[in-house]
């Protein structure tokens, strides 16, 4: 797949250049299939579905918190303060073994996807995202304007970089 090829390219670059060793990246991508989307995810970049005025997380983070902490039964307060809370369990460019997670979701006109990096969803709460994506008269209406509003909200919350927001309207 294209994701596996990207992983191989990143690994080869890191192996051939010592300054790049240890680099990696997360990924979330969506394929529009008309009345549905197929979403691919590696790491902690996320896909959300906005439909009927509600925001729903589609992907599951590949992080220590999601894959180790929660199954151990640690409470949310402990997880939010845990020293391993930001540790990824999977990323492109880290290993030849790659766990690409795939999700298929049905959509309908008026719905859209939000693809985001942790620079956005790590700083802007789901409630804030929902308000920005909703029909609030204080928030611009086009998808491009909503993306800019999301990015500005992350910057206002202290996000210096790595803030990605992509909105894709359902067909």
Label for each model-derived stretch:
Residues 1-171:
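PP2C/PPM-type serine/threonine phosphatase catalytic domain
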């Amino acid at each position: 797949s294209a994701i596996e090829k990207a992983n191989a390219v990143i690994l080869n670059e890191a192996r051939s250049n010592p300054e790049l060793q240890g680099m990696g990246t997360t990924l979330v991508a969506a394929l529009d299939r008309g009345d549905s989307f197929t979403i691919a995810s590696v790491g902690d970049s996320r896909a959300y579905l906005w439909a009927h005025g509600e925001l729903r997380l589609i992907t599951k983070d590949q992080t220590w918190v999601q894959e180790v902490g929660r199954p151990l039964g640690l409470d949310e307060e402990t997880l939010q303060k845990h020293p391993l809370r930001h540790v990824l369990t999977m990323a492109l460019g880290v290993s030849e073994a790659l766990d690409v997670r795939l999700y298929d979701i049905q959509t309908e006109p008026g719905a859209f996807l939000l693809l985001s990096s942790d620079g956005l969803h790590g700083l802007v709460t789901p409630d804030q995202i929902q308000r920005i994506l909703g029909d609030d008269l204080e928030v611009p209406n086009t998808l491009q304007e909503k993306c800019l509003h999301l990015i500005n909200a992350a910057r206002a919350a202290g996000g210096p970089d790595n803030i990605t927001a992509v909105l894709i309207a359902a067909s």
